[in-house]
């Protein structure tokens, strides 16, 4: 019994709302927009964390990119890399980053980066158990996982070990991390690494653009694994926070992936 209590001694250091979002591949300006049929048509997979102000979250929104275009498999304890694209105080900065974008290239002419599509909404926590940091979430939308969630590995709930990379250290092989765009931490926060390659204790390290991290699949039952009841709410199109808090426009961002789990 003592061993069981020790496993469940968990400190929640941050909680809030989480959204999963994908962006279709870039196309030429003169090409008609096509619906996404599967993960091969996905350019990038994002995760947005909005810490609740009462949990001490310094950044209102963190827009993150997850490598391999999907979450790590929890059953296989798979690991995927990621990095923080944007740290924003307003929803408008995030919605602008996720909107349709037109740009010119010298060799291929004008290109279009399609608007991102929401693929999941839920609640999350960052929690410490001993020297480990965990990211755990529970979905509120869609009600049932569809093809989108299955291919992006968005389970109804899951937990991951989270390690944040020291920008002053080299990257281990086969992580997908590199030195480009690395975070520039103030001296006080840089000391949190204590000359280690990764840190696992302080979520403030995620509040800097360019911060790089590793997610390792841990489990698919947060209550059993961490002793935390995430208490997701029943949401619908009318109550979804992604439209109220993140302020995504339904007219610009197809919502079928979020509500029905079908690709668009």
Predicted regions located by residue number:
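Long, contiguous regulatory modules within eukaryotic nuclear regulatory proteins
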Residues: 1-67, 79
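Cysteine-centric segments in proteins
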Residues: 3-5, 12-13, 22-24, 86, ...
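Eukaryotic short linear interaction motifs
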Residues: 27-32, 42, 54-63, 71-75, ...
């Amino acid at each position: 019994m003592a061993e069981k209590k020790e496993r469940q001694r968990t400190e929640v250091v941050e909680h809030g709302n989480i959204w999963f979002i994908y962006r279709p591949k870039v196309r030429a300006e003169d090409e008609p927009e096509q619906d996404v049929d599967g993960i091969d048509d996905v350019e990038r997979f994002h995760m947005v964390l909005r810490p609740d102000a009462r949990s001490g979250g310094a950044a209102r929104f963190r827009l993150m990119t997850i490598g391999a275009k999907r979450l790590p498999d929890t059953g296989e304890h798979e690991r995927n890399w990621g990095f923080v694209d944007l740290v924003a105080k307003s929803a408008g900065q995030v919605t602008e980053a996720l909107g349709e974008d037109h740009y010119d290239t010298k060799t291929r002419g004008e290109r279009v980066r399609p608007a991102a599509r929401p693929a999941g909404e839920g609640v999350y926590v960052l929690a410490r158990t001993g020297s480990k940091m965990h990211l755990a979430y529970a979905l509120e939308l869609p009600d049932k996982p569809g093809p989108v969630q299955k291919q992006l590995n968005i389970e109804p709930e899951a937990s991951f070990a989270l390690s944040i990379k020291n920008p002053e250290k080299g990257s281990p092989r086969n992580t997908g991390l590199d030195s480009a765009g690395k975070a520039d931490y103030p001296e006080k926060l840089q000391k949190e690494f204590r000359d280690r390659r990764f840190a696992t204790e302080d979520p403030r390290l995620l509040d800097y653009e360019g911060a790089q991290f590793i997610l390792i699949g841990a489990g698919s039952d947060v209550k059993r694994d961490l002793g935390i009841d995430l208490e997701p709410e029943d949401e619908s199109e009318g109550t979804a926070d992604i439209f109220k808090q993140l302020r995504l426009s339904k007219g610009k961002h197809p919502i079928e992936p979020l509500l029905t789990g079908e690709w668009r």
